[in-house]
Amino acid sequence: MSSREIRIATRKSALALWQAEYVKARLEAAHPGLLVTLVPMVSRGDKLLDSPLSKIGGKGLFVKELETALLENEADIAVHSMKDVPMDFPEGLGLFCICEREDPRDAFVSNTYSSLDALPAGSIVGTSSLRRQAQLLTRRPDLEIRFLRGNVNTRLAKLDAGEYDAIILAAAGLIRLGFEDRITSAISVDDSLPAGGQGAVGIECRSADTEIHALLAPLHHADTADRVTAERALNKHLNGGCQVPIACYAVLEGDQLWLRGLVGEPSGGKLLNAQARAPRAAAETLGVQVAEDLLSQGADDILKAVYGEAGHE
């Protein structure tokens, strides 16, 4: 193995590069002598920063270019934020490793106010996520939600410039980039259910490349993988991409998985909730079960309306 090289396809954002460097360090620690190099590239989602993610659409906005690199043998693995990974993979590719999850919660960031509850009526809150928006406006319909895109540094700079009273970001990204001190308060999953896979890093590679699969095995975290499998099964059954108002979060209780799911109107008008428990071996079935519960409550109507507004499927 000492002469083997692994090329990692990654986006060029600071967070994506952190994740790729993390995987590189883990691989080098597990396999001394292994040569690991990064192949940075720009995704469509990185280029289109002037529109809400829900408008420019679709699934795989941040991964397609990386998958092309794998298919054309320009890279051996691709490192992704699991919340950005589509449910289906191109023929010949698959997800072969999920690393241990960082804090999956959303983070409240403000220079003035201590928490969501402390925000006065009419406060301006920045987020690009319909999932966060739906839950936030259900809880606080007196707030004004404004579009916020860009990398973590850009978003923090906009807050510091006074464009927003507060912004909502994934806690994991702030922690990984050394901005943990900017987290004013972590938002309980009871108040803002995370996106499926939030806080987890996944590794995609060619399905036939068994040598790479073996090298990745020490990085795989079974507890995280089972939780994320249930979350992704819910998302897939709802035909959800990463830019729709779907939230889902699974926790392990011994050998049982507890999965909570949510679909909400971006306006905060309606929020549907469902939950169930099952053995961890039945993670996919559990995801489908909770998704079916949401569909029986009318989730499909909410999601069709969102897709119609975005102009894509």
Curated annotation (Swiss-Prot):
Its cofactor is dipyrromethane. It catalyses: 4 porphobilinogen + H2O = hydroxymethylbilane + 4 NH4(+). The keyword Transferase applies. Its EC number is 2.5.1.61. One of its GO terms (molecular function) is hydroxymethylbilane synthase activity. Pfam families: Porphobil_deam, Porphobil_deamC. Signal peptide: none annotated. This is Porphobilinogen deaminase. Monomer. Disulfide bonds: none annotated. It is an enzyme of class 2 (transferase). Binds 1 dipyrromethane group covalently. It comes from the Bacteria. CDD domains: PBP2_EcHMBS_like. It comes from Pseudomonas fluorescens (strain Pf0-1). HAMAP family: Porphobil_deam (MF_00260). The porphobilinogen subunits are added to the dipyrromethane group.
